[in-house]
Amino acid sequence: MTKKNIGVLLVCCCMVASTIGILTNSAGVFFTSVADSFGVGRGSVSLTLTISNMAYAVGGLFTVKWIRNANFKKTVLLFSCIYGISTAALGICPDVFFMYVLSVIRGFSTGVIGMVLVTILINNHFTSNVGLATSIALGFSGIAGAILSPVFTSLIQSTGWRMSYVCIGILSFVLYLPCILSPV
């Protein structure tokens, strides 16, 4: 592996940590706090994850089109901003319905800059060890979920779920900075 390959792999690890690690694998830590705050069942809040994942799948269908028709960096910048802002905006939702709407937006945006884009980057930069590189990058979804879930739980306990969503929105965007700023 060359230095450039390692750099691309690190970028992909950050991208997967942001999209799958934060969007999906650590989402459950919010369910009880949000449900109690809104006076609804946890199932109503967990539906946000289902909606996000469905929108993620749809967004992934548009990845190649956007990357082909637009500048790569601008696409990543645009959709990582949308993802970060929509995640932070979950903290100001007055009820669960608005969380559903934001879940569509954040799911779609991460779909565009998520798994499909990561595999495209790996396939474009690696001529050998493609499977290994893909496995390492995708492994960061679980690593991020395992590390961030207790961190987010602690954050929710200390600052409340609303402020935690703002912090997570910022983190979601920050994890995309290596992709935006590096010469990938």
Regions found by a protein language model. Name each.
Residues 7-47, 59-63, 148-149:
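Extracytoplasmic
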Residues 17, 86, 97-113:
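Hydrophobic core of transmembrane alpha-helices in multi-pass small-molecule transporters
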Residues 16, 80, 84-87, 102-103, ...:
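A generic transmembrane-helix signature of 12-TM secondary carrier transporters
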Residues 52-57, 142-144:
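Short hydrophobic/small-residue motifs within alpha-helical transmembrane segments
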Residues 58-97:
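Conserved MFS/SLC helix-loop-helix module at the cytosolic interface between two early adjacent transmembrane helices
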Residues 103-139:
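Cytoplasmic helix-loop-helix junction between adjacent transmembrane helices
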Residues 136-184:
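Helix-loop-helix hairpin linking two adjacent transmembrane segments in secondary transporters
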